[in-house]
Amino acid sequence: MKLHESSSSIVYKGYQLHPKKMIVLKIDKMTRGASLENEIDIYRHIHRDPLASTQGIPQIIAYEHYGLVMEKLGSSVHDLFEASNHQFSFKFAVRLAIKMLNIIKYVHSRGIVHGDIKPSNFLFGENNGKADYKRLYLSDYGFSKFFLFKNGDHIPFREGVMFTGTPRFAGKWSLGGLEQSRREDLESFFYVIIYLIKGKLPWDEKFTKKKDLDAYDMGAIKGHTKKKDLIKDLPKEFEEVFDFVNHLLFYKQPDYEFLKNLLKKML
């Protein structure tokens, strides 16, 4: 049964006989399978840590050059948000954001930038065919990359990098052609929180109306969006979150605990 299809892959639901459990099979549509090969490399690296599956990383069952078999998870945050008429309670959204941040921090600790933080890539666990909202996972590492070399050095800052990701939630720097680092994941994370609380983002209408916008144009629109338009009617802590994310440096390790404590203050 087909679950999802994108420009690069098709995802099917299946059933494993030994041991008996539901699985998903992701097939690369590209001739050379480059996108899925990258995702497999990322998953293999993360799962060198035996505790990875307890930190919000989907469990990998098997893989080949053009296919990836994973555990079947529940619905996505996007699915739940749609089913809730684009309305999460404030506290539910913030609690969810804290779980998301914990997973992003873990992915970064493995030397990886996710590169496509958005509601549809966060999946809930599944228990007996039903979504388990206590467990959250971050999926889809097709656009992910290592930000650390094997010797531990950070990748260099670059300009003129082709944009990958989802424009609606992407950071303004990556849309503008700058190399991604941890700050881009956290900027996207900030936009996701705003979206889950308010149900929209300031640039949604412009992105929808102007069909000829390229990534650079979208980045410029985000860069010129005023702070007050993003955090209007939200608690004062969101101004601190905005300033924190907006002043992150390319090479610097983010202070995740500071950000988490700001979120906890709002509960």
Predicted regions and their residues:
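Conserved structural core of kinase catalytic domains
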Residues: 58-91
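Conserved hydrophobic alpha-helix
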Residues: 100-107
